[in-house]
Amino acid sequence: MIAHNLGYPRIGDNRELKKACEQYWSGAITQQKLQDVAKAIRTNNWLTQKDAGLDLIPCNDFSFYDQVLDMSFMLGLIPERFSSLLQKKDLTELDIYFAMARGYQKDGYDITAMEMTKWFDTNYHYIVPEFRKDQKFSPISEKAIREYTEAKVVIGKAAKPVLLGPVSYLLAGKEKEAGFNRIELIENLLPVYTKLLATLQQNGAEWIQLDEPFLVMDLTVQERKTYETTYTALRNLFPSLKFIVATYFECTGTNIDIAAKLPVDALHLDLVRCPSQLSDILTPAFISSNTMLSLGVVDGRNVWKNDFSTSSTFITKAIAALGKERVMIAPSCSLLHVPCDLDNEKNGNVLTPEIKNWMAFAKQKLHEVAALKKLNRAPMQSEELRLLKANTESIENRAKSKLIHKQHVKARVKAVQPSDSQRKSLFKSRQQIQEKALQLPLMPTTTIGSFPQTDEVRANRAKYKKGDITLAQYEDFVKTEMTKAIEWQEKIGIDVLVHGEFERNDMVEYFGEQLKGYVFSENGWVQSYGSRCVKPPIIYGDIERTEPMTVAWTTLAQSLTKKYMKGMLTGPVTILQWSFVRDDQPRRDTCMQIAFAIRDEVVDLEAAGIKIIQIDEPAIREGLPLRRENWETYLNWAVECFRISASGVKDETQIHTHMCYSEFNDIIKNIAAMDADVITIETSRSQMELLDAFVDFNYPNEIGPGVYDIHSPRIPTTDEMADLLNKAMHVLPVRNIWVNPDCGLKTRRWPETEAALINMVAAAQKIRKEITTVV
């Protein structure tokens, strides 16, 4: 048996990479210092995995920003708009790499960033490769080779280079012009992959992990064929190189026949998301082959301890069919998606000892993988018996704990009625009522909710949490920041204001801190994109709201302006998606509990005089099962949960929702079924591509297509945003259009925020002047 890992968090135990990248971008440190920080993280990661007892350890899983962008750079896939930067002698390879991710706006250049989207159904984002017809590939970076050479010095032959497989790389991208299918580029791409693999082999690599997560997706006949021909070609070119093809996040399903027949040395299956596929793969044909089977039995996407007894049943079954020599044990996917080390959680008042004992972070999961290998070697020694006993006690303690269950919460969910998810009137009637009540201008301007969380804001929050300042002092500071933000919004002419969310650390954690059934970590950070890290709250039990969460701050903000102040809430599906969720009941039940908690908050905001309430659901699409056949069930309960949260108010109260990073052309009917009065969406990076859905679907409610990309520091011009609004007007009735950024502005700095929003208001005013009739 071989114990191995698919990938490890690259942010560092204390977010060293985030801090170093941001310091480099601001000019505070040199590139050499940034590289030194990166090397220290890589070395620590490799030694941590070696010390845990793993036989094969991934390398090239580190990234300064994103592993898909790394692959693009290694393959020489640099969009034409960045080509001029290659001639700038003062820009290094890393500078151009960052420019592709973040845009470049200096020295007379004004280059937009590449598109970013969610990595399958996770909370991680990747930079989308851009393909053109007859795309040529030419290696620019030798990152994988450098990092393998570096790893070999630290961990020797255990080093296993990890690459995004060629077919998944193509499928992860987008065609940037018509007239071709990106999968056809495999003939141009394969020679560059071949060169990379050859160099790795020449440098001593024995195992290569090729991640092919698209093997769990619905594939066309052409895509299925491409998998077969690609891996046959690689096998013929590299008969002695050991390939492990890794699938994860879902069942291989109808693709299992392809996966099982690939001429590779090992196939990895995610048995956490899809335990049934172990039986599916153990057919006579697979058993009679020489392919090893990697069992993804340790959950790479959640924080709960592995149940050794359950995992051992899978391992025992595989050993019985294949023999120990053909079995590998691993996490279900890369550990990128979980925090680094549970040992960094030292405050028992934050993460209570009882609940902490139910959990495992990345480092602990490595030890679980190694322990499972030991436990399945017969006969068990005293060490193995001790490991099994401790694990069994922890699993049983969690199952029996009185902390988890609240019968009155369960009863409310069980008693849900259709009327709980229905507004009093249809949208057409509500729109007329709201227009009369609110008296907003045509194409009203607003922002999504948050304003920049400056160093001063973060420092004051940290001081309060450490006890260095009192609650009163902290609240005075927040009120001062909020007042400045409100006055500034009024000054530049924004129509519907927000309070800026200066009191909130994170749009999910803030609510989790005030809901029963949640627990938190101090250092449970995971990477969202680039240098952005999030610290997901942890749902361990039934969810209950025992008192108002946002009413005090929102009503205070409303008292500071005569304009409308939006109440700002996070929706139930997003709270679910962006948390580590209990795994002892269906996700639908947990989401329904959250929905009723948010509903109670919405009703209280309305009673306090708030006329416009936004319930953010940026994660609604990422919750979609990866297979279309499973979509309907999820969408039914997700939409129902949103409607429950929003349907307790009068017709006069305008409900907004927001979705960012969302490509939901294919679920537009379900988005309409949410029945929000106004939806704001991410569209600018894709140049309003999202609005294509409205050509075929007459979206009934109001909509704010984002007119500028907040994920880049680049400042859009007034004309650019006016052009995007003109595109929207060709698809949507003018009376239904709102003007807003793509997403919240928390991660931006004030100078770029101010400049961009001033231009945005000017764009709206320009379009209003040009409109002579209301469509």
Curated annotation (Swiss-Prot):
UniProt keyword list: Amino-acid biosynthesis, Metal-binding, Methionine biosynthesis, Methyltransferase, Repeat, Transferase, Zinc
GO terms, molecular function? 5-methyltetrahydropteroyltriglutamate-homocysteine S-methyltransferase activity; zinc ion binding
Q: Which InterPro entries match?
A: Cbl-indep_Met_Synth_N (IPR013215), Cobalamin-indep_Met_synthase (IPR006276), Met_Synth_C/arc (IPR002629), UROD/MetE-like_sf (IPR038071)
List positions binding L-homocysteine.
448-450, 501, 616
Q: What is its EC number?
A: 2.1.1.14
Catalytic residues as annotated in Swiss-Prot or TrEMBL: 711 (proton donor)
Q: What class of enzyme is it?
A: transferase
Q: Which SUPFAM superfamilies match?
A: UROD/MetE-like
The entry marks the following residues as binding 5-methyltetrahydropteroyltri-L-glutamate, namely: 15-18, 118, 532-533, 578, 622
The entry's free-text remark on the cofactor is:
Binds 1 zinc ion per subunit.
- Tell me its family: Belongs to the vitamin-B12 independent methionine synthase family.
Describe the function of this protein: Catalyzes the transfer of a methyl group from 5-methyltetrahydrofolate to homocysteine resulting in methionine formation.
Q: What is this protein called?
A: 5-methyltetrahydropteroyltriglutamate--homocysteine methyltransferase
